């Protein structure tokens, strides 16, 4: 049983879009109920924001984030570990083109070089934590047409609140801008993934965690998810669990799946739904 307060930011969001959204056609041909612009704030000191009104596949969230941090663009590494969440978009050889991990770790420069945005962000957090330029972008306009799927969670920024007591630690917050948000299937993954990343970066930079702020553009519920959403909204949320990171590796790129444990995850049963490809 978690000692954290019960929060329902995600469920309130899902209910808001289901109630106030407009019908909109979309690229997949499925149809959506959509609103434009929404924000949720999660205090990471109130628990790890893993949705509780349905069981969320935590293993896939952790593996996908580690895969991004590898700078990888081939699903083979994920498949070898039993994770198939990217298979629908992969080419026959498993490649996805220059997607998230490639842009995070090796954004191409005009002179033929590459920028490791994650390494640069960590370096700046350690040397100039008051910077307003600690940003990582996956939205590389010049390479969008080479990607199997254009970035949905496109851009994120870190912010350090100074220590409030002598000898205390600063607090690391992260804000994500997600241009396209599949609220039922995708957003629970995205919230947990960036909350996990914030914890990892905070550990590497000797900071405490602050808030994770999720900001969405086109926020939608697919028409073929309506029954699942109604079921989920009929359930009462539990308190969020606690994230434990068992060791501090030498760098942000050296974490392994076994380093993470979520304690006290009380949740309702999983709800299956089709993915719009």
UniProtKB/Swiss-Prot annotation:
Keywords: Cytoplasm, Methyltransferase, Nucleotide biosynthesis, Transferase
UniProt main location, coarse: cytoplasm
Pathway per the UniProt entry: Pyrimidine metabolism; dTTP biosynthesis
Listed InterPro entries: Thymidate_synth/dCMP_Mease, Thymidate_synth/dCMP_Mease_dom, Thymidate_synth/dCMP_Mease_sf, Thymidylate_synthase, Thymidylate_synthase_AS
Statement: the UniProt record of this protein carries the keyword Ribonucleoprotein: no
Binding site for dUMP: 27, 132-133, 179-182, 190, 220-222
GO cellular component terms listed in the entry, alphabetical order: cytosol
Enzyme kind, highest EC tier: transferase
GO biological process: dTMP biosynthetic process; dTTP biosynthetic process; methylation
EC number: 2.1.1.45
Entries under PANTHER family matching the protein: THYMIDYLATE SYNTHASE 1
Protein family membership: Belongs to the thymidylate synthase family. Bacterial-type ThyA subfamily.
Protein's name in the database: Thymidylate synthase
Species the sequence originates in: Albidiferax ferrireducens (strain ATCC BAA-621 / DSM 15236 / T118) (Rhodoferax ferrireducens)
Lineage: Bacteria, Pseudomonadati, Pseudomonadota, Betaproteobacteria, Burkholderiales
């Amino acid at each position: 049983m978690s000692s954290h307060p019960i929060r329902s930011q995600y469920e309130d969001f899902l209910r808001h879009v289901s109630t106030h959204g407009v019908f909109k056609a979309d690229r997949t041909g499925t149809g959506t109920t959509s609103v434009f612009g929404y924000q949720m704030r999660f205090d990471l000191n109130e628990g790890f924001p893993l949705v509780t009104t349905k069981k969320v596949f935590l293993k896939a969230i952790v593996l996908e984030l580690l895969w991004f941090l590898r700078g990888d663009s081939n699903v083979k590494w994920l498949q070898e570990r039993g994770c198939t969440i990217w298979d629908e978009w992969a080419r026959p050889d498993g490649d996805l083109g220059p997607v998230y991990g490639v842009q995070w770790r090796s954004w191409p420069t005009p002179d033929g070089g590459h920028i490791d945005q994650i390494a640069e962000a960590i370096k700046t957090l350690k040397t100039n934590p008051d910077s307003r330029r600690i940003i990582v972008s996956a939205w590389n306009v010049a390479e969008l047409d080479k990607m199997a799927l254009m970035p949905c969670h496109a851009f994120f920024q870190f912010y350090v609140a100074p220590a409030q007591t002598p000898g205390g630690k600063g607090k690391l917050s992260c804000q994500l801008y997600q241009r396209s948000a599949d609220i039922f299937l995708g957003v629970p993954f995205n919230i947990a993934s960036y909350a996990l990343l914030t914890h990892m970066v905070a550990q590497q930079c000797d900071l405490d965690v602050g808030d994770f702020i999720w900001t969405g553009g086109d926020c939608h519920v697919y028409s073929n998810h309506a029954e699942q959403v109604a079921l989920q909204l009929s359930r009462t949320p539990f308190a969020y669990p606690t994230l434990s990171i068992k060791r501090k590796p030498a760098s942000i790129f050296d974490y392994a799946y076994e380093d993470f444990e979520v304690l006290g995850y009380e949740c309702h049963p999983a709800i299956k739904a089709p993915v719009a490809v």
